């Protein structure tokens, strides 16, 4: 457990080598990254997966919390582990936390990984937000939830039922408020960090053209990798491809990972 102020964070840690931090999607926990974390650890990286406040054993207040506060949680984890600046990778909502951390605490961030990132300056449209809420509503009929998840998270041919479990609606609502309280212009550029942008091929929230626009805006420090046959839930649809992209990029940051 990592404690800072009145926040206590459960951190799933594995592997040895340079640090890669994995931050999960809106209303979901660090175990979504299980197959990816295993592959990264096997590739000789130290993998840290902090559970967000309210998930697992992590606790902390939500009243008045902004994106900056969630980034401070991750800063505390990296400082506690004391293994040097980290490659901080955020899936979906986690990408904003990663970018905010790189903005506020650049000395802790070797690079930023954006996975299925909605980097636009505006929130998701109402129909998408409604589908996300339905997906996380465990009291709704499974058929309605699967339909919503298929629309907003999964590519054609993928089985959305794999995400029926693992939702934390109260955390989702609190994270959404925290994100809305912080203007997107603040974290947009991820400070001055190098950025790996992992773009799903069929994402209704984060479009391929958004990735290209982001690269044009920030220039050569952005590397875009498109993952075929995937949508917003790319980390569970294509864990091997996502892992391979992360490992290849991490090797450019640390050409010879420490043993």
Describe each model-derived feature in a short phrase.
Residues 37, 49-89, 244:
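Active-site loop/oxyanion-hole signature of alpha/beta-hydrolase fold enzymes
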Residues 99-104, 110-139:
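Flexible "cap/lid" loop of the alpha/beta hydrolase fold
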Residues 123-126, 138-191:
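Conserved alpha/beta-hydrolase catalytic His-Asp/Glu region
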Residues 191, 197-199:
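Short beta-strand/loop motif that positions the catalytic acidic residue
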Residues 202-206:
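Acidic catalytic loop of the alpha/beta-hydrolase fold
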Residues 221-259:
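Catalytic active-site module of serine/aspartate enzymes centered on a nucleophile-bearing elbow/loop
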């Amino acid at each position: 457990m990592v404690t800072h102020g009145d926040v206590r964070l459960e951190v799933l840690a594995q592997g040895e080598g340079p640090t890669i931090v994995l931050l999960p999607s809106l209303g979901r926990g660090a175990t979504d990254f299980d197959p990816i974390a295993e592959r990264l650890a096997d590739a000789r990286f130290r993998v840290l997966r902090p559970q967000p406040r309210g998930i697992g054993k992590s606790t902390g207040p939500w009243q008045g919390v902004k994106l900056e506060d969630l980034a401070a949680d991750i800063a505390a984890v990296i400082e506690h582990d004391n293994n040097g600046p980290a490659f901080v990778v955020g899936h979906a909502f986690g990408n904003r936390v990663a970018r905010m951390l790189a903005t506020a605490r650049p000395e802790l961030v070797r690079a930023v990984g954006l996975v299925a990132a909605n980097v636009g300056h505006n929130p998701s449209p109402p129909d998408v937000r409604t589908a996300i809420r339905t997906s996380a509503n465990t009291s709704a009929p499974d058929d309605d939830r699967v339909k919503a998840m298929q629309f907003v998270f999964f590519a054609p041919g993928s089985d959305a039922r794999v995400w029926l479990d693992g939702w934390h609606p109260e955390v989702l609502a609190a994270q959404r408020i925290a994100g809305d309280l912080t203007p997107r212009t603040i974290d947009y550029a991820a400070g001055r960090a190098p950025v790996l942008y992992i773009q799903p091929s069929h994402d209704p929230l984060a479009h391929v053209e958004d990735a290209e626009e982001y690269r044009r805006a920030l220039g050569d420090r952005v590397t875009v990798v498109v993952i075929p046959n995937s949508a917003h839930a790319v980390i569970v649809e294509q864990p091997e491809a996502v892992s391979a992209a992360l490992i290849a990029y991490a090797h450019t940051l640390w050409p010879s990972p420490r043993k």
